Design a protein with these regions (language model features):
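Conserved glycine-rich cofactor-binding loop
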Residues: 7, 14-16, 38
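Catalytic Tyr-X3-Lys loop
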Residues: 100-119, 138, 162
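Conserved mid-core segment of classical short-chain dehydrogenase/reductases
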Residues: 70, 93-108, 151
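C-terminal helical subdomain
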Residues: 179, 183-184, 191, 199-233
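Conserved glycine-rich Rossmann-like NAD(P)H-binding loop of the short-chain dehydrogenase/reductase
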Residues: 28-45
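Rossmann-fold scaffold of SDR-type NAD(P)-dependent oxidoreductases
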Residues: 11, 83-91, 114, 139, ...
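Amphipathic alpha-helical dimer-interface segment in Rossmann-like NAD(P)H-dependent oxidoreductases
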Residues: 74-77, 113-133, 170-171
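Catalytic loop of short-chain dehydrogenase/reductase
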Residues: 92, 104, 130-131, 135-175, ...
Length: 233
């Protein structure tokens, strides 16, 4: 797999699937812009990438901060003039509870993270993705977005909305650009979010984030119909 010369941006890259994907992209030759709220964790990801022979730029930021995404897009445009890969991975898991008891503040944060930030990312980076020879958007999703489960209402509803937004965007750009969109369900993966949802689960019983990361890179190495949906087993 060769992504040499590609410019990639990964949100939620400080740990878990985001960090693993950033490292896999860099290993394949891409220069990776890693974003997240935890600057120290991002520095660790950057160091791991450099030690493996790759290159990266850290961009600590809060996706919910006003104009933060637009400012990042301006910086990327000024330095590279395009974006080849946008991996939308950042997410939060509200406390699992009945729909009638969902905390409005927590729901609002999930809406902002999964829906509003996704729209802002697409809106700000679309011009740069179109300047790529083969712009790609990868959105990480969850099985409960299409197969809802009791007590998962806040997370499932906002991730489902995110999927719809990505699907609509894919259709809108299909015939007027080379940009393509893939929605990837990582399945059961050893992450902090998974541990929060399933505190009694043996972490060794589920796959490591690197498995998902490798699947994403393999997807980017070829072509695919858009919108494309993929599950990682």
């Amino acid at each position: 797999m060769d992504l040499s010369g590609k410019i990639a941006l990964v949100t939620g890259a400080s740990r878990g699937i985001g960090a693993a994907t950033a490292q896999a992209l860099a290993k394949a030759g891409a220069h990776v812009i890693v974003t997240g709220r935890d600057a120290k964790a991002l520095e660790g990801v950057e160091q791991a990438i450099h030690e493996a022979g790759g290159t990266a730029t850290i961009a600590p930021m809060d996706l919910l901060e006003s104009d933060a995404i637009a400012r990042l897009a301006e910086a990327v445009a000024g330095r590279w003039g395009r974006l080849d890969v946008l991996v939308i991975n950042a997410g939060i898991l509200p406390t699992l509870m009945p729909v009638v008891d969902i905390d409005q503040k927590a729901l609002g944060k999930a809406v902002s993270t999964h829906l509003l930030a996704t729209q802002a990312l697409l809106g700000s980076f679309d011009p740069l993705l179109r300047k790529s020879e083969a712009g790609r958007v990868i959105g990480l999703t969850t099985s409960v977005a299409t197969r809802p489960r009791a007590y998962w209402g806040a997370y499932a509803a906002t991730k489902a909305a995110q999927e719809v937004l990505l699907d609509c965007y894919a259709q809108e750009v299909a015939n007027i650009s080379k940009v393509k969109v893939a929605i990837v369900n990582p399945g059961a993966t050893r992450t902090a979010m998974r541990a929060k949802a399933y505190p009694g689960e043996d972490p060794k019983s589920v796959k490591e984030p690197s498995v998902v990361a490798d699947a994403v890179v393999a997807l980017l190495d070829g072509d695919f119909p858009s919108p494309h949906r993929m599950s990682v087993n």
